[in-house]
């Protein structure tokens, strides 16, 4: 059986990692061993943060909805309860967008929620 020299595959593997680490600071973009660790860690952060992004945006939307709801005389939880009772199915992303860009429409929806809570 002939001897297999790994020069070509090793070079390709190193090049792949160093290409992924392009733009990293210092040895992280130049040294294979350090670059490999940096790329692995970056992948872990990316995986974790793709999940956290969803939580963070939902929290941001709730904060924005709450701020606008309080200007309309309701708390966030009372607003959501009122919307459910009024059978208004708007998700938090849309409500938050309305709270920022269309305060008049948000106020009208808040009034409907208030009416549903009262009646």
Curated annotation (Swiss-Prot):
PROSITE patterns, sorted: RIBOSOMAL_L20
Q: Which GO cellular component terms, listed alphabetically, does the Swiss-Prot or TrEMBL entry include? A: ribonucleoprotein complex; ribosome
Matching Gene3D superfamilies: 6.10.160.10, Ribosomal protein L20
On whether Cytoplasm is a keyword of this UniProt record, the answer is: no
Give the Gene Ontology MF terms in alphabetical order.
Answer: rRNA binding; structural constituent of ribosome
Keywords per UniProt: Ribonucleoprotein, Ribosomal protein, RNA-binding, rRNA-binding
Name the InterPro entries on file: Ribosomal_bL20, RIBOSOMAL_L20_CS, Ribosomal_protein_bL20_C
What Gene Ontology terms for biological process does this UniProt record contain?
A: ribosomal large subunit assembly; translation
State what this protein does. Binds directly to 23S ribosomal RNA and is necessary for the in vitro assembly process of the 50S ribosomal subunit. It is not involved in the protein synthesizing functions of that subunit.
Instruction: Please name the PANTHER family in this protein's record.
Output: 39S RIBOSOMAL PROTEIN L20 (PTHR10986)
- Which family does the entry's similarity section mention? Belongs to the bacterial ribosomal protein bL20 family.
Can you name this protein? Large ribosomal subunit protein bL20
- The species this protein belongs to is Legionella pneumophila subsp. pneumophila (strain Philadelphia 1 / ATCC 33152 / DSM 7513)
List the gene name.
rplT
